[in-house]
């Protein structure tokens, strides 16, 4: 089995450098749901490490501009924290609600940093309020009733568009089939 570990900022910069040398123009920074201030500071240091290897393109991704387009997939944070990310060049934020069913949500996340349905639902609005230009959202199909998840996902995307004046940068719908005989667990 794979062992998880935290990469140091220099390692992250090295990985970003390798990606840019291979011609990649977009990097998605993914970090675990570490709710501690230390975890957040690591995410900021990671963004700084990526920004140290190439100029960051603000705003929308384009093939006609030089530099990196930097996006983040992190736990929900307050708007002030997203402003700190935006100041580092992060211009897109992706967050999966996982399930839009408020009755099912506590079954999937009975405790820990993801336990608040409302906090997770507010994450994309907080990102927009903090200056993140592009928002991506999704639900994990197979957890709840597909029709409910679809309608709620579209409604959430529309709400964000009305709030920000911009359509969602991405809408994801992974796992379109139920995961039969796979119990919910708190750890892999």
Give residue spans per PLM region.
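Short, hydrophobic beta-strand segments
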Residues: 1, 29, 180-184
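Core AdoMet radical
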Residues: 2-14, 19-143, 165-172
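Auxiliary Fe-S-binding modules of radical SAM enzymes
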Residues: 14, 20, 151-155, 161-188
């Amino acid at each position: 089995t794979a062992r998880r570990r935290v990469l140091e900022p220099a390692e992250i910069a090295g990985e970003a450098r390798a990606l840019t040398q291979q011609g990649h123009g977009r990097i998605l920074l993914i970090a675990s749901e570490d709710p501690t201030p230390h975890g957040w500071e690591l995410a900021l240091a990671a963004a700084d490490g990526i920004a140290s290897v190439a100029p960051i393109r603000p705003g929308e991704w384009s093939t006609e501009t030089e530099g990196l387009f930097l996006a983040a997939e992190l736990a929900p944070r307050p708007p002030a924290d997203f402003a700190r990310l935006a100041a580092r060049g992060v211009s897109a934020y992706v967050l999966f609600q996982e399930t839009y069913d408020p009755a099912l949500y506590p079954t999937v996340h009975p405790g820990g940093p993801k336990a608040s349905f409302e906090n997770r639902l507010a994450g994309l609005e907080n990102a927009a309020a903090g200056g993140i230009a592009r928002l991506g959202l999704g639900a994990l199909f197979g957890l709840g009733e597909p029709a409910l998840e679809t309608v709620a996902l579209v409604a959430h995307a529309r709400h964000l568009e009305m709030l920000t004046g911009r359509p969602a940068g991405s809408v994801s719908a992974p796992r379109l089939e139920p995961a039969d005989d796979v119990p919910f667990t708190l750890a892999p």
